[in-house]
């Protein structure tokens, strides 16, 4: 699977990637491969992802690519890898809220926002780590271990920035769903 270069992920914003996908200058599979490569490289240090859905995401990216080639365009998120905060239900995929008692919880249906992302053609790449049950601001209290700050490892990632800095800003993904 050909991957977008990590350098391109570092400098190109979501609008640029979207336009390149829409005009078929870049494929959703290439973008996904670049994101998965980045996750593999840096997630062991950052612990931003609880679950990575490589196989499912590849199937979604391949389907998005086929749709785009036939002229079906769902909108600006079509083919874009999106991470989901582990607080939001994803059908058939563990949703734990980073809480030990929910470690094996698998919902039967998607949260409304997740369903809307899928309808828009977004590629769900994985579930991101968070403070247990969303009850704190540090990101240190997760059943899956603390989330680390990509810019300054000696500092906490902190609250909302947990997901934003550790997945989107370090360019694991181009977009993140969660508050």
Kindly give the residue locations of the regions a language model identified.
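Conserved hydrophobic residue
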Residues: 26-27, 73, 173
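Short glycine/serine-rich loop segments
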Residues: 109-179
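Enzymes and membrane/adaptor proteins characterized by extended Gly/Ser/Thr/Asp/Glu-rich
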Residues: 14, 76-113, 140
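Glycine-rich, aromatic-flanked loop segments that form ligand/cofactor-binding clefts
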Residues: 65-88, 122, 127-129
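Flexible, acidic active-site loops/lids enriched in D/E/S/T/G that coordinate Mg2+ and/or position polar
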Residues: 54-77, 103, 107, 117, ...
């Amino acid at each position: 699977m050909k991957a977008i270069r990590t350098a391109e992920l570092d400098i190109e914003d979501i609008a640029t990637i979207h336009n390149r996908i829409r005009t078929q200058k870049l494929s959703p599979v290439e973008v996904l491969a670049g994101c998965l490569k980045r996750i593999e490289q840096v997630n062991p240090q950052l612990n931003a992802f609880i679950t990575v859905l490589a196989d499912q995401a590849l199937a979604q990216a391949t389907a998005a690519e086929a749709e785009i080639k036939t002229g079906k365009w769902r909108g600006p998120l079509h083919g874009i890898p999106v991470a989901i905060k582990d607080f939001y239900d994803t059908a058939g995929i563990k949703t734990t809220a980073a809480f030990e008692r929910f470690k094996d919880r698998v919902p039967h249906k998607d949260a409304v926002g997740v369903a809307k992302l899928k309808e828009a053609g977004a590629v769900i790449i994985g579930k991101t780590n968070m403070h247990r049950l969303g009850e704190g601001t540090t990101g240190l209290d997760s059943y899956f271990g603390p989330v680390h700050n990509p810019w300054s490892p000696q500092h906490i990632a902190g609250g909302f920035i947990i997901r934003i800095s550790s997945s989107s800003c370090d360019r694991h993904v181009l977009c993140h769903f969660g508050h």
